[in-house]
Amino acid sequence: MAYGTNAPFGLRPLSSISGGSWTEKVNEYFIYADALGTNTYGTSIFTGDPVIFNPVAATTLAGAPTIARYPIDTATVVNEITPVLGVFVGCEYESTVTGTNNLIKSPYWPASAHVVPGSRIKAFVIDDPDVVYDIQVSTATNVLNDAKFSTDAATDAFFTQNFAFGLGAGGGNLVPNNPVTGNTRTGQSAIYLNIVGTAATNRVAATLPLKTIGLTSDPANVFLDAAGAVRPFLNLRVTINNHISRVGNLGITPA
């Protein structure tokens, strides 16, 4: 875990909001593939990515119920209003790439991969709305200070407020820059909590996907540096605020 370093990893399950550890329960869903297996879902989904019900496939009996990666709008975060189904943690499919119809168990779905005709792409999703997750703070801007969860530890922090996801963007003074996609070697997500993109006036919106409830408990996740300044790229504990099984709540109004 790279605390204090710009290394977003999506949503990582930690515990339950009702107390105790995460139970490791997941449910099985599907990723879209046509009958021939040559037209499949065209966006990669990585472990830690938030997912939704596919709004296209859900309208047809043959295609439902399939999932899609959450529609992240880093530039206009108030557009992130779709209820979250859960968090993707891997998939299983029959690949035709080698010509031997191999069963592939993967931490990520490779966009548009071909599968055996008539087979289904299984996706495993943490869909419990009570799960508490670990996520890293970052920013879509080129300003390092914008990657801080607070500008003044004594007077300014954003706990119990609502936030959007971010992916990519950010550069310049961010070292390293935000990755624009998940890691195809490890299968890990590159999604982060978009701190600066979610303006104070929007952090009360019940439709935003994330609610912050505290710092991730780890000795390495240090809020302040040696000079007493707030560090960037902190890890936070969050819940899914706007969930398919639970209506989102308003964030606390900033003082």
Residue ranges and their predicted role:
Residues 1-255:
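Surface-exposed, low-hydrophobicity beta-strand/loop segments enriched in small/polar/acidic residues
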